[in-house]
Design a protein with these regions (language model features):
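Substrate-binding cleft and catalytic face of glycoside hydrolase catalytic domains
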Residues: 59-62, 97-186
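N-terminal amphipathic alpha-helix/helix-capping segment at the start of soluble metabolic enzymes
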Residues: 6, 37-44
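N-terminal signal peptide
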Residues: 2, 11-36
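Aromatic- and Gly/Pro-rich amphipathic surface segment
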Residues: 68-103, 107
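Short, solvent-exposed beta-strand-terminating loops
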Residues: 51-73
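Catalytic cores of glycan-processing enzymes that make or break glycosidic bonds
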Residues: 2-3, 18, 23, 78-82, ...
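Transmembrane beta-strand segments of Gram-negative outer membrane beta-barrel proteins
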Residues: 46-48
């Protein structure tokens, strides 16, 4: 692997880890340790960003009307996850999204790709909408835009509402295509 790309990969991994990690802007004067790598090394319009999935970062697993997902069920079975960890709190982005976005902005990211928790919008996977879940994502998107960052949204990251798994057998059911369409159209 070319050394410049290895450094970029290390920067992206370090910056995505949070935890107070600070990285110099890749275009900063005197950043010779980057081997000349800077934003100018990429095509005009290249978007620098970071990405997460709802279950891995949001936390607030049973807060404000969110229903359980298949990941909640799986992670709460002792021994399924190392150290019996789960996403109940995670990094608590649900309550700390402004801090997270501010950190992304301070690292000079242009965009943030995140997934929406289907069970935060539709606690039962279908039917009644959870207005508090909708408000959370509206607030996150609006704050990203306010900070000049582009939101990229992933509608599904392997966190099917548990109610749909139990009622229809999950993705093995042909009914899921219609249910996902309803969710996406919302």
């Amino acid at each position: 692997m070319d050394a410049r790309w290895a450094v970029l990969l290390a920067l992206l991994v370090a910056s995505g880890g949070g935890g107070g990690v600070r990285v110099c802007a890749a275009g900063a004067k005197g950043a010779n340790w980057l081997g000349g790598l800077s934003r100018a090394s990429f095509p005009k319009g290249f978007v620098f960003g970071t990405a997460t999935s709802a279950y891995q970062v949001e936390g607030a697993a049973s807060t404000n009307g969110r229903g359980p997902s298949i990941w909640d069920s799986f992670a709460h079975v002792p021994g399924n996850i190392a150290g019996n960890q789960n996403g109940d709190v995670a990094v608590d982005q649900y309550h700390r999204y402004k801090e997270d976005v501010d950190l992304m902005k301070s690292l000079n990211f242009d965009a943030y790709r995140f997934s929406i928790s289907w069970s935060r919008i539709f606690p039962d996977g279908e039917g009644k909408v959870n207005p508090e879940g909708v408000a959370y994502y509206n607030n996150l998107i609006n704050y990203l835009l306010q900070k000049g960052m582009t939101p990229y949204i992933n509608l599904y990251h392997y966190d099917l509402p548990l109610a749909l798994e139990k009622k229809y057998g999950g993705w093995l059911s042909a009914k899921m295509a219609d249910l996902f369409t309803d969710y996406a159209d919302f």
